[in-house]
Every structure is written in structure tokens, then in C-alpha cells.
Amino acid sequence: MTATRGFTLLEILLVLVLVSASAVAVIATFPVSVKDEAKISAQSFYQRLLLLNEEAILSGQDFGVRIDVDTRRLTFLQLTADKGWQKWQNDKMTNQTTLKEGLQLDFELGGGAWQKDDRLFNPGSLFDEEMFADEKKEQKQEPAPQLFVLSSGEVTPFTLSIFPKGQEPDEQWRVTAQENGTLRLLAPGESDEE
């Protein structure tokens, strides 16, 4: 009987498993580009806003989002009857997100009602708010949000652009809410006209 030379199927499969495992380990260590970070951040904000909109409709509560362009921070808020605007307490989602260092935000409220060109009155209260202040309620209240997600399904019209620092406007990922409450995620170069 002659002995055959060569590798068994088991040996070949073992080598393939080792090569594929090492390839996965190497690919996982590759850095993510800033353009990919912009895409991931825009998709994350869009999905969170959809979740917030659904939660508002189902629970009957009003929510808001505070956007700080300078610090690249997005804060999700909930309106409570006794404390006013507070950070949204949810086990499955963080209530505050800070974007990566290489990204930049551009935020613009939409709709004619939000523009300040044709105001009849100066913004602010007509009454002395200190007169009605309750000294017992000196609890820390979050600043009011710029975006409102109401239990009626309404969303403040806006455009939030997320892009790498120093890039042209055609590299922007945009999340928009239109006058009719439709939320859209727009890739770079994509137009929001349907």
C-alpha cells in the first residue's frame, strides 16, 4: 500500500479559520474615517429622533432636543409637569451625545414662523417673572430645547448638518424635519425636494 502525500481536509479548514480570524482582527483595528463618523453620527441622530417621535405619540409626553453647535453636544429632554425640562431618563439610550472631535455641526430652524425678520414684539415675557417665582422650586432646570417633539406628532421644522471640519457643503449629512412633520436623512449631495 502506498502512502498518499498531501493535507487532509481538516488541516485545510483549520488554516482557513486561522487566516480569517486574523483578518477580522486586523480589519477591526483600522481607524474609521471622519466622513464615516459623520455618516454614523447623522444616522444615529436620525434614528434617535424617530424613536423620540414614536415615544412621544405612544406615551403622550412632550420631548425636546437641545443642540449646542459650539460643543457639538445633542441633549434629549423630557417635559415634566413639576420640574420643567429635564434630561430624558431612558435605560436603552443615552440622553446626551457629544460628536467626535473632527466633526462640525450646522443647525438651522426651518419654517417662516421661526425666523426673526418680521417680529411684532420683542422676545420675552410681558410680565415680571420674578414676581411669580416660587422660592421653593429652586431645582435645576435644563435650558429649553430648540427642537420640540410633541405628543401630537408635530416636530419643529429644522435642518441639522453634520460634516467633517473644513469640508465643503456637498460633504454634509443632513437630518431635516419638514413643515408636515416628516423626518428625513439626506446623504451628501442629496436634495430634500421630493
Swiss-Prot record:
Briefly state the modifications made to the protein after translation: Cleaved by prepilin peptidase.
GO CC annotation, single: plasma membrane
Cellular localisation: Cell inner membrane
Question: Transmembrane residues, as ranges?
Answer: 12-32
Q: Which domain of life is it from?
A: Bacteria
Q: Residues of the signal sequence?
A: none
* Assigned keywords, A-Z: Cell inner membrane, Cell membrane, Membrane, Methylation, Protein transport, Transmembrane, Transmembrane helix, Transport
Membrane topology qualifier:
Single-pass membrane protein
User: Tell me, which GO biological process terms does this entry list?
Assistant: protein secretion by the type II secretion system
According to the UniProt entry, which residues carry N-methylphenylalanine? 7
Q: How does it assemble?
A: Type II secretion is composed of four main components: the outer membrane complex, the inner membrane complex, the cytoplasmic secretion ATPase and the periplasm-spanning pseudopilus. Interacts with core component EpsG.
Regarding protein family, the annotation reads: Belongs to the GSP H family.
From the Swiss-Prot or TrEMBL record, give the protein name: Type II secretion system protein H
